[in-house]
Every structure is written in C-alpha cells, then in structure tokens.
Amino acid sequence: MIHNETIRWPAPAKLNLFLYITGQREDGYHELQTLFQFIDLCDYLTITPNLSGKITLTPNIEGLALENNLIYKAAMILKTHTAANNGAHITLEKNLPMGGGLGGGSSDAATTLVALNHQWNINLTKDKLAEIGVLLGADVPVFIFGKAAIAEGIGEKLTPAYPAERSYLIAVPDCHISTAAVFQAKNLIRNTKKRTHLQLINQNWLNDCQPYVKKNYPKVAKVIEWLIEYAPTQLTGTGACVFSTFNSINEAEIVLHNTPDWLAALTAKGLNNSPLNELLATLK
C-alpha cells in the first residue's frame, strides 16, 4: 500500500570542508579523506506516488536524456524492490548549480531514494538504501544518512563528524568543471599523507584539487583571489563553486553586498543534520 499524499522533499547541497587525495587504486578510483557538511540551500522534489507503474519527471534537465537523469535512475532502481505497478510523478525545483561541487545530482538521487522508500512504503533501512545509492555515485550515501561525516576510501566509508555550523558565502564562477577531468589530470596532488580523524579536525583545512583547478580555470582563480581578501576561502569538491567561511550570517551578507557584478554568489548556513533528515523525522 502506497502513501498517497504529495510531499515536497528537500535535496540539500553539501560542502567539502576539506578534501585530501591520499592515493589512487589500481582501478583508477582515488582514495580520499574529506569532510562533508550540508548547507541550507536545496533543490526540491515534489513527489506524488501512483499506481501507473511509470516514473515521470517534470522538467527534465535540458540536454540530458531522461534515462541518464539520476532522479529517474534512482526511482527505477528502487522500483525493483517494490510492486511492479508502483509509479510516481516527480516535479524538480532546481536551485543548485550543476557541476559546481555542491553535490546537487547526488543529493537529488538520495532524496528520490529516501522519499520513494517512504511513499511507496518499502521501508528499507538507510544502510540498504546506501548500498543502492553508491551504485549511482560515491557521495550519494552521505546524503541518504543525512549527517555531517568524514568520508574515506572512495567516499563510501563514513564516520559521523560535528564541525562547527558556520556561515558561508558561496561563489558560483561562470564555468563548468568536469570531476572526471580533474581526477584524470596528471599533475593533480595524489600523495597527501593519510591522517587520523583527530589530526584532520585540528588542522588548517585544504582541498588538494584547488592548485590544479586554480591553474587551469582562470575564472575560479579570480574568484578565490577576490574572496580570500575577506575570509578563508577554498574550493568545494572539484569546483567550480568556492566558499568563504564566516562567524555569522551577517558577516557573510556584508561581503555578499560587495560582490562584483561579474560574480554570482549567495550565503548559506552549515548544517550537521540535513533538512531531508528533519522532514523524514516528522513523517514517522
């Protein structure tokens, strides 16, 4: 029996507060140590379950075939765990930039899995959902669990973490960076010494992708050079988005008001418990 109600689900963005590349495996995947924290900037998926057996999505992302959309792929994978006639109509409000390092596609996929698990009344555990999610992307599980975490391995080994919930200014450079291209780069840092969690939390945080991205993407370098005059600034993920850290949202807003015309930017609050988790808790 499905839950018939229409629900608007958040799919929050994330920041990588640090990202270290500690090696590369024989299969080409990179060994990482990174700290994920959510922010209060979200895509939204409004989902109405039905018994049509079909998944419909409005609007689909321009230039992307429906079968390649992570929302659609997540729903179709989950359908194999439920009655064949279960379907859903999904409406996407896309607020997160694509290819920005904020995890938008992975978060959308995770929200789809969590939402349909509830609305189709499948009741898989989060551990099982994460096993499904990692098939769609290495960082999908962190969005499913919805807790700030240190991720290791290729990103699938998660340990809960409790970084300060700071305020951020997030800048969106006018360029797209391919994650695959960054990780395939010959001069990418790949030999950072692996650290204990205590060492990771108690040191200055860096992103090993940043030197390569700054050198090869002048628009990102320009943003970092401008923002670092105001506050500690670094790349999130492989970019292109850049974030600066502030003690209060008011401090971040002051810098936002000084943002030059050539730069899109916004402010956000760090969250150790995701908005998706908070909504799910009210539905049980």
From Swiss-Prot:
Q: Nucleotide-binding: present as a keyword of the record? A: yes
Q: Which InterPro entries match?
A: GHMP_kinase_C_dom, GHMP_kinase_C_sf, GHMP_kinase_N_dom, IspE, Ribosomal_Su5_D2-typ_SF, Ribsml_uS5_D2-typ_fold_subgr
Alphabetically list the UniProt keywords.
ATP-binding, Isoprene biosynthesis, Kinase, Nucleotide-binding, Transferase
Record's signal peptide: none
Q: What class of enzyme is it?
A: transferase
Q: What is its EC number?
A: 2.7.1.148
Where along the chain is the active site annotated? Answer: K14, D139
Q: Which reaction does it catalyse?
A: 4-CDP-2-C-methyl-D-erythritol + ATP = 4-CDP-2-C-methyl-D-erythritol 2-phosphate + ADP + H(+)
Q: Which GO terms describe its molecular function?
A: 4-(cytidine 5'-diphospho)-2-C-methyl-D-erythritol kinase activity; ATP binding
Amino-acid positions noted as binding ATP in the UniProt annotation, renumbered to this chain: P97, M98, G99, G100, G101, L102, G103, G104, G105, S106, S107
Set out the biological process GO terms recorded for this chain's protein.
Answer: isopentenyl diphosphate biosynthetic process, methylerythritol 4-phosphate pathway; terpenoid biosynthetic process
**Pathway the protein takes part in:** Isoprenoid biosynthesis; isopentenyl diphosphate biosynthesis via DXP pathway; isopentenyl diphosphate from 1-deoxy-D-xylulose 5-phosphate: step 3/6
Which family does the similarity line name?
Belongs to the GHMP kinase family. IspE subfamily.
Instruction: Provide the protein name.
Output: 4-diphosphocytidyl-2-C-methyl-D-erythritol kinase
